[in-house]
Amino acid sequence: EDVAFHIEDLPEATAELQQLLAHHGYDDACIYGHALEGNYHFIINQSFSSEAEVERYEALMNEVKMLVVDKYDGSLKAEHGTGRNMAPFVQYEWGETAFELMRAVKQLFDPKGLLNPGVIFNDDPKCHIRNFKPLTLTNAHVDKCIECGFCEVNCLTCGFTLSSRQRIVIQRE
């Protein structure tokens, strides 16, 4: 995920985000980003193989929402677009009036709801914890891949045959 805080809030917000991740058992979480823009990304190792793991993740995201929006008046999406993971929180962050205006604009351009249905505007408050894409375990190195695409342009073999991510997907299939 990527969130944004006001630059003057970064020291306190960073410490609280770290504490929040640790509180929920994400001791190996990685926070990085673009501090001059107040933009942070965080990556966690998350299994969704049990109801307890799904509940842990749901609790984390609810607290991230409150930390970013309520406490620091920040943004739940900074650099990357709103996806299914943040869809349940769009109205919370923007308020009902702005949310309904954005929904109306989407309806004007996509009256049949064909473009990314449920990605930004989703009436299911738990859409971020449903329909997970399971990743087949293959080996210790490949299993760490979260399919973010970073390797696509940074791999030495990029452009020779398959991309790094394509090779990983093939191993998983």
Residue map of PLM features:
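Activity-critical C-terminal alpha-helical subdomain
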Residues: 88-137
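Local cysteine-cluster metal-coordination motifs and their immediate loop/turn environment
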Residues: 78-85, 142-160
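A glycine-rich phosphate-binding loop feature that marks nucleotide/adenosyl-phosphate handling sites
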Residues: 32-43, 77-90, 117-131, 158
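Acidic/polar loop patches that form or flank catalytic/metal-binding clefts of enzymes
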Residues: 73-79, 102, 113-117, 153-156, ...
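Flexible glycine/proline-rich, aromatic-decorated loop/lid segments
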Residues: 37, 62-68, 73-79, 160-173
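Ferredoxin-type iron-sulfur electron-transfer modules in oxidoreductases and energy-metabolism complexes
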Residues: 100, 121-142, 152, 158-173
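C-terminal substrate-recognition/cap domain of FAD-linked oxidoreductases
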Residues: 1-59, 67, 72-75, 83-85
